[in-house]
């Protein structure tokens, strides 16, 4: 679901900016699971690699 993936991405960015990286990782991972071939998943994977 692209809409849910976008929401997850947006929420992940918010958590990341607040310094709550464990919540950001959880949401970015969910984005990849929900829509693995979307641009949202690509961006989420990039952020996951930057956090770790």
Segments and roles (model prediction):
Residues 1-4, 31-43:
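Short solvent-exposed coil/turn linkers within tandem alpha-helical repeat scaffolds
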């Amino acid at each position: 679901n692209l809409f849910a993936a976008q929401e997850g991405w947006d929420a992940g960015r918010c958590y990341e900016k607040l310094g709550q990286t464990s919540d950001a990782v959880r949401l970015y991972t969910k984005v990849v699971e929900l829509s693995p071939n979307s641009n949202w998943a690509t961006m989420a994977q990039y952020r996951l690699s930057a956090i770790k």
